[in-house]
Amino acid sequence: MAAQIPIVAATSTPAVARNSKKRPASPSHNSSGGGYGASKKKKLSASGFAQGVSIEAMNESKMASSELSSGPVEKAAKPLPFKDPNFVHSGHGGAVAGKKNRTWKNLKQILAAERALPWQLNDPNYFSIDAPPSFKPAKKYSDISGLLANYTDPQSKLRFSTVEEFSYIRRLPSDVVTGYLALRKATSIVP
């Protein structure tokens, strides 16, 4: 039985070399006897060797790169003009210190916090601020339909958007016209 293990190992390695398309870690790769468990042990020892070789190669490359970079040290010593040399990071706050990142408050929380503040009657708010008039021209709406009105009747000063509204406005009595103008707060004395 012990004599068969080296034979199995010898037959499994050429299969790896012959069929290079299969991954070496796949269970279908070890088709020879010995089962999955036996080949797993062999792979662990082989991968351990490969890792040892790669670590040694990495250490050698680091040493070689450090020998090459020892020449121009003057460029690294020059301080950057936009960095403060006396800056010391406080170390508290943020995710680095183990604190949670800030979360946004929703509208209810903001309003509740504002209500809890000691407001005076003279304090400015959005309703007490007098804003200057806008530079954009105000939109004009029809007095009859409420649609955007591009036209104004020169006789009654009512706004309209279509031809049908214009004919309707021309048939209105003067008291109804003054009522429409009063709704728009544009009362003008019409003779």
UniProtKB/Swiss-Prot annotation:
Biological processes annotated in GO: chromatin remodeling; DNA recombination; DNA repair; positive regulation of DNA repair; positive regulation of DNA-templated transcription; positive regulation of telomere maintenance in response to DNA damage; regulation of cell cycle; regulation of chromosome organization
Subcellular location: Nucleus
Superkingdom of origin: Eukaryota
UniProt-listed InterPro entries: INO80C/Ies6, Vps72/YL1_C
Record keywords, A-Z: DNA damage, DNA recombination, DNA repair, Nucleus, Transcription, Transcription regulation
Region (Disordered): 1-41
Transmembrane portions of the chain: none
GO cellular component, one term: Ino80 complex
Record's keyword annotation contains Transferase: no
One Pfam assignment: YL1_C
Function field: Proposed core component of the chromatin remodeling INO80 complex which is involved in transcriptional regulation, DNA replication and probably DNA repair.
Complex formation: Component of the chromatin remodeling INO80 complex; specifically part of a complex module associated with the helicase ATP-binding and the helicase C-terminal domain of INO80. Component of some MLL1/MLL complex, at least composed of the core components KMT2A/MLL1, ASH2L, HCFC1/HCF1, WDR5 and RBBP5, as well as the facultative components BACC1, CHD8, E2F6, HSP70, INO80C, KANSL1, LAS1L, MAX, MCRS1, MGA, MYST1/MOF, PELP1, PHF20, PRP31, RING2, RUVB1/TIP49A, RUVB2/TIP49B, SENP3, TAF1, TAF4, TAF6, TAF7, TAF9 and TEX10.
The protein's name in its UniProt record: INO80 complex subunit C
Species: Mus musculus (Mouse)
